[in-house]
């Protein structure tokens, strides 16, 4: 059988990508609607290198998908799978937080006196910032499978509450938001003005390259 390492709970897509590399998996599967409404639920596939599965590999997967929905598939009893040591539960969120702590100077961020606000949009990022930067002001950081009726895409029209929070508090230096599976980011400045991804990439290149 296929050996499976399964996350203990919901996790973000970057956590699965890191897990694929850390555990030397051949494939990573993320069940998610990504930044879309929950009715779009599907799955993302990650290659052994942690990034999106390459096109030729995706073609192989697509060819194995039937043209019509069918329930005529072989089912394996979960307990039997465990007894045969084919299934192991792992804490991908803990692994991800440990990786972040080892690769970023979080103490320097905490001591910088920068006030951050974060909106995970009810998505898979609800715990990680809370664990890494506990003083961050957060909204929409509880489980809501329907995302409160708003597609969890971090663009300005979906983030009005974060923008208004920054404008009203007047002491927030930066606002961050992530989508449903926490692999897309939105950014606000201290005035509550949205910075699109194109300008965000330019800022990252300017300071990191």
Regions found by a protein language model. Give the residues of each.
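Short alpha-helical
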Residues: 11, 124, 203
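Gly/Ser/Thr-enriched, mixed-charge loops and adjacent short helices
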Residues: 41-169
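Small/polar loops that bind or transfer phosphate-bearing groups
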Residues: 8, 120, 197
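N-terminal small/polar loop signature for handling phosphorylated ligands or for N-terminal nucleophile
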Residues: 1-41, 132, 136-188
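Broad structural signal for hydrophobic residues in well-ordered alpha-helices, predominantly aliphatic
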Residues: 19-20, 100, 129, 208
């Amino acid at each position: 059988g296929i050996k499976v390492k399964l996350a203990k709970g919901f996790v973000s897509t970057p956590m699965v990508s890191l897990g694929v590399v850390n555990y030397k998996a051949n494939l990573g599967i993320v069940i998610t609607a990504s930044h879309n409404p929950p009715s779009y639920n599907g799955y993302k596939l990650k290659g052994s290198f942690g990034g999106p599965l390459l096109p030729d590999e995706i073609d192989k997967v697509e060819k194995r998908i039937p043209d019509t929905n069918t329930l005529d598939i072989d089912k394996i009893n979960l307990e039997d799978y465990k007894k045969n040591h084919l299934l192991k539960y792992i804490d991908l969120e803990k692994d991800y937080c440990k990786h972040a702590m080892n690769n970023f100077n979080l103490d320097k961020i905490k001591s910088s006196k920068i006030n951050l606000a974060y909106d995970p949009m009810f998505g898979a990022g609800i715990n990680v910032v809370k664990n890494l930067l506990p003083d961050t002001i957060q909204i929409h950081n509880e489980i809501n499978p329907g995302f409160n009726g708003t597609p969890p895409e971090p663009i300005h029209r979906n983030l009005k509450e974060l923008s208004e929070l920054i404008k009203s508090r007047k002491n927030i230096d930066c606002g961050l938001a992530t989508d449903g599976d926490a692999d897309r980011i939105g950014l606000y400045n201290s005035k509550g003005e949205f910075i699109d991804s194109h300008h965000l990439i330019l800022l990252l290149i300017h300071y990191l390259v």
